[in-house]
Amino acid sequence: MGRLVVEEVRAAGVPLVGGIGGSDGVAPPDDVTRYADIAALAGASDLVIDFTHAEAVRAHAAALADAGTAWVLGTSGLSAAEEAAVATAAGRIAVVYAANFSAGVTLVLSLAERMAAVLPASAYDAEIVEMHHRQKVDAPSGTAIGIGRAVARGRGVALEDVIDSARHGHTGARRTGAIGFASLRGGQVVGEHTLIFAAADEQIALTHRGFDRRSFAAGAVRAALWAAGRGAGLFTMEDVLGLR
């Protein structure tokens, strides 16, 4: 993702200060200034676009908040403690947090909430199916969880109270109101998500397929341009696109 972000930043004509390598040892492109750590990068920048691993989020949150540097975060698979660190940082700086920055997925999230508000949980079972490349380490994907949260908001419930993502063996009948997840991994699939509302007499499906990670990088740069100079707060791509 880093190389695509660099290309999109330059295409937008925005000054690129530099970057740091991820915990997997991947370094920035050779023509990008490399900083020793997140604190050094934050001190030199107005805004940081971050696609590193979840384990780095708490340290990044503290360093960016201390430096007053805005943060566009696209790391998925965050724990409750890591999400809390993001929220704490958002009390001091502008944070745009999204598991997926593509405009298409953002529209899916908006539609999912609206559909869930109209289709009663007692009659329409909500299921989310996602597939990604074989190297992806977290499941369900952050985007799938985001879709689930959108459905839960539309229904006025907490996702944690209705999630069903561990079906195996004899599970018994489906719980009314549950939001189900199925995760597939294989090949080099960039990302595919389908939200299904299944009733006794009809089925509605909403699908997004990503074919190139460039859409994520372009969306992240769009979020960065929107967040630059903005006051503290926790924002999403729906805010960036003016959907709420």
Model-derived features with residue positions:
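Anion (oxyanion) recognition and catalysis
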Residues: 10, 65, 120
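Rossmann-like NAD(P)H-binding beta-loop-alpha module
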Residues: 107-123, 139
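Short glycine-/small-residue-rich Rossmann-like dinucleotide-binding loops
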Residues: 52-53, 76, 183-185
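An anion/phosphate-binding loop that grips the pyrophosphate of nucleotide cofactors and donors
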Residues: 45
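N-terminal Rossmann-like NAD(P) cofactor-binding module of classical short-chain dehydrogenase/reductase
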Residues: 48-49
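Rossmann-fold NAD(P)-binding glycine/threonine-rich loop
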Residues: 58-67, 74-97, 106-114
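Hydrophobic beta-strand scaffold residues
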Residues: 16, 34, 71-72, 95-97
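C-terminal substrate-binding/catalytic lobe of Rossmann-fold NAD(P)-dependent oxidoreductases
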Residues: 2-41, 123-244
